[in-house]
Amino acid sequence: MEKSNRRKRPSTPHLSCELCRERKIKCDKVDPCNNCVSAGVVCIPVHRPRLPRGVHARRARPMSPTFVPPRAPTPVAGPVPSEKKQTDHSSGAVAAVDDDLRRRVHRLEAVVNSMRAAMQDSSPATVKQVSCEYWGIVGRADEEKSVLNDSYPAPTSSLACNASIPMTVQGQPPFESRPDCFWNNMVGEIEHFGGDVGSSSETKSDDHSSLAPNMPRMGDGGLRFLGLSGNNPTLTWTPVLEGKEMTRQLCQIYLQQVDPIIKILHRPTVEKWMLHGERYLDYPERHVAVDALRSAICYATAASLTDDQCSAIFQRSRSSGIVEDFRRECETALERSGFLVSPSITGLQAFVLYLIARRSEDRGQAAWTLTAVAVRLAKALGLHRERDETFFNQQMRRRLWLTISLMDLQASFSQASEPLISTEEATSTFFLPKHINDSDLDPTMTHEIPDREGLCDTTFALVTYHIQLAGRALNFGTTASPQHKASQQQHAQRFEENALRLLHFCDPESSPYAWFTWHGTQCLVSGARLSALRPLQLPQPSNGSSQPPSSPSPRPQEHNHELLRLALNVLEKAHLMHTDPRGEGFRWYVTMPWHALAVAINECSLSPDVVRIQSAWPTIEACYQLLRRKGVAGQEEAIQRPLEKLICQARDKASPLLQLARSSPTFSLGSSTGTSAAPTPRSRASSTPSDTLSDLSWPTAFSHAPSQLGMELAPVGPVQPFAKLDLDSLLSQFDIQGQPLLAGQIPPVDAELSLRTWEQLMSDIDAESNQLLP
């Protein structure tokens, strides 16, 4: 009787293997099949009853994958052992559940393979092996897991398949009627795993993820999807940081050329960490966030290096791609830190340094796009809100938030867009840090200290913090009106007073930092006065109209000579910082102010004064050539084309007067040469108050530069009671304030024509920006 029953029960058929089924190719149904042997992968045979077809097909009741009976593992080669007999009911249920699982795991496999392909040590064979391991885990459940762990072990970096996938498959509750419940749970497990890897909390010591920074991992925080790594996802470059000595050299340059400008790190703490080998704050050794900060410091330093410094340190020229190598290494460290998943102050500081260096290296839209990420992370960390914390943490959080606010404003100007942080929000979150030296601060300090008098580590940083506040109020306010104009004057006057108060009795000859702070601040103040007369206002529709709002009539004192004088002041200062040897360490930061250049060109093309054009044109040509050599990209092309058209028109008019060869303009700026060599006064007190206080427009000073400026620190001196200061009493031959032209000897230019020409230029820039949109 038993033998007859065995004869009636047919053996389980041998169907196409898993790989052939997925590839939709014919399988010879041997073990292993020839297709899998040729591909060099593990063949996963399928032994089950054939699924019913036609009217006999019916969907089995959904069941939990924990009820899937295990199958015996099949070796890579050799005979297939005899299978266990299964009932028709259990076979049909298992088949239905297998199909449901495979559809979901196939989607999971595609995601995992795409992540694995982006890792450093990825290879096609390894990806195929992981793919087959996933199918084996789903098809054979518990017993297959142990065999795969023993036979085909995967490294820790290969997404920890053996740890995460079986846990998900076995720990699932019974399936619900919703078909994507299993997939959603799988995605939740992956996100949870990525969050653990990317943890960078300052109070938590990570024993496994943070102590292996050189190991590829999937907790990259999604930076690859943001395009940080460009078109090379495998990241197969040679590391640049080969030794501690090179890191020390870069740190020393950072403290001289970057740290006085970008005051988001504590200088003594960085010195103890990178120069003396001590731990960084309370972080464990080789923490991923600390490694990201180290790479960001080196990248920012590389972006600030001159050609001579590159040759001395790396025996390579700057044009050989040394900065790009540091950028890729910084991107890899940021990806490993996972700061998008679990943000921290240290990780955000590294990201801000990366954006500042990226902005100085690349004028495209990458830094503009990623600035939004920095703003969101800062708000996620609560940097825009005041908290009850230690004095040290309070100061560092304020510096970081105001630096990000400044970056947001700079990015909006460079791409002709509104900032993410509104004027109201910037005003309500404006909590100024103390005007002190970094040596006055200590991480263990709990009590507050008063502001210092004189030049400090944070002097220029505080000037730029005032700029980001005034720039929003002046350029992104309400429509033009008498009330708005008065409010702009108040904003401009407040900025000028705050900025110049910080520089009282600053000795610009005492150090490069003092020299650069002196001239940089005066360039900003000149740009503020210029913006009061010619604000950067791109035409925008108003009240549903497609026409730009009409500008108010110019005031009587708004004449050609004042505009040209202020524009030349800005250009003279910017050119001085580009040519004077004392500004060499900060040249990476300064860009040519296209706004002031456009105003100067426009006013020269309308001015009837031959003497004034002859004195101003060499400065204009020199600055225009500097702007062209810097190059533009992305939305900045919209500025370059109308500016080129404007200067061609001005050359046509100026050539008969200056005998200027339009085809090959030369730089014969004798006065500027004298300016570079002339000493700067030691006292800035002035008895000549200025009537024209301006609304500050940030791009008039450093149109697309990152935040602060400075270098080696000057000694501290006392501050006298504030008196109204002149821009610069030694603004060389181009300081035409004292010339009789302003006294009315030359009839002024038609202010209406000047204003219409300026509005036409802004309209052309807006039109070019729209053409660049995809």
Swiss-Prot record:
The lineage of its organism: Eukaryota, Fungi, Dikarya, Ascomycota, Pezizomycotina. Gene3D superfamilies: Zn(2)-C6 fungal-type DNA-binding domain. It comes from Aspergillus fumigatus (strain ATCC MYA-4609 / CBS 101355 / FGSC A1100 / Af293) (Neosartorya fumigata). Residues 67-78 have a biased composition (Pro residues). Residues 536-548, 675-697 have a biased composition (Low complexity). Residues 61-94, 536-559, 665-697 are annotated as: Disordered. Residues 17-43 bind DNA. It comes from the Eukaryota. GO terms for molecular function: DNA binding; DNA-binding transcription factor activity, RNA polymerase II-specific; zinc ion binding. This is C6 finger domain transcription factor nscR. The gene is nscR.
